[in-house]
């Protein structure tokens, strides 16, 4: 730990302007299928196959044992409002571990939605998503010799 005191932040989450929940947690992860095998997975989120067009909303160390990740369609508009943030706790939006945007003053609400820009991931022809998962996540024993 550093000298700063880290405390839980309370979030209010809405999807397409519909209230979903309030949650107290260290943070909130919103990821695509591509990001679902990274930080979201480490926080207990599900793995989405690459062609699934969806968002995963995963709480980071939530106060509630009933907190579960939520999978929603990629055309959804997500709004997250920081309802309660202790004075001595800094709050940031961090994009893909690179860009850090502080939430200060009136900028307590942020929005997430599908971008109109697209990019293609390049894989070798022999790439197999499930084989990669088996290898990286040590899912099962080898099927060789059966």
What is each model feature region?
Residues 1-28, 37-146:
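Catalytic phosphate-donor-binding core of small-molecule kinases
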Residues 33-34:
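Membrane-helix boundary elements
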């Amino acid at each position: 730990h550093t000298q700063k005191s880290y405390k839980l932040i309370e979030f209010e989450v809405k999807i397409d302007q519909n209230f979903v929940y309030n949650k107290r947690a260290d943070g909130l992860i919103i990821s695509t299928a591509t990001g679902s095998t990274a930080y979201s997975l480490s926080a207990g989120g599900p793995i989405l196959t690459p062609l699934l067009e969806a968002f995963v909303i995963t709480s980071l160390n939530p106060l509630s044992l009933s907190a579960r990740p939520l999978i929603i369609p990629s055309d959804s508009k997500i709004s997250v409002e920081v309802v309660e943030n202790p004075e001595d706790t800094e709050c940031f939006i961090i994009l893909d571990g690179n860009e850090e945007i502080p939430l200060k003053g009136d900028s307590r609400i942020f929005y997430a939605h599908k971008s109109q820009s697209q990019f293609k991931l390049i894989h070798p022809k022999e790439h197999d998503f499930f084989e990669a998962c088996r290898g990286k996540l040590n899912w099962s024993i080898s099927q060789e010799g059966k």
